[in-house]
Amino acid sequence: YPGQHGDTEVYRALEVLAHRRFFPVFTFLFGIGFAMIMGSARRRGLSEPSAMARRLTPLLILGALHQLVHPGEALLFYAAFAFAVLFPLAYVKDHGRRRTIATWGGIVLTAIGGFFGGIFVIPGLLLLGFAFAEWGLPKLLDVSPSPATKSLLLLIPLAIALTFAQLKTMGTQFYFFTANYAGLSFAAMWVALTYTLLRTPLRNVLGAAFAPLGRMALTNYIAATFIIHGTRMALGIP
């Protein structure tokens, strides 16, 4: 990763186009996935807490092992925070109450997490993704993406404004905060834009590109670590 005081243009490009932009999306999707696990258990008459524990425990162990070769990786934190904020919701039988808790908890924790950045955005975004699925929004927006399209009228200028603020504050004490919130707004814009594009002739193209990536996301994430380590050894990079 280019240093802040060297490769300046590359550093700025990565900060504006990649860093903090997609991690929130992945976290949000994990939240949706955990809601699907609970929903599947509920439909089959199985214990939702048990279903969550069976998924989260292996993820926690895998994340802990992955930390040994990739310090700072996300899986351990996904599992730990999911145990902390999502697992208790499996015991909330009133689904209206469950959705409400996840929604407001997600909003508050994401706002707070944006202030601290890094792994601290995980709890709120897991809850927001969970609430998103519990409200049935993935199916609703797939049928009619109009709300997502309309939200772009707010999200696009917001993302641009916060990105501009991020660039203006680069090198100052405020940069960390503007960069975090710019990343969150950018991620929200990408989600809304994707839903909009999925109702266009690009749907088949996007589906062909993203569906395999979604199915292999965990495999690719783990494999990338070993590819990077192998490449570094081959090139003699410490």
What are these regions (language model features)?
Residues 1-238:
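Alpha-helical transmembrane segments and their immediate juxtamembrane cytosolic regions
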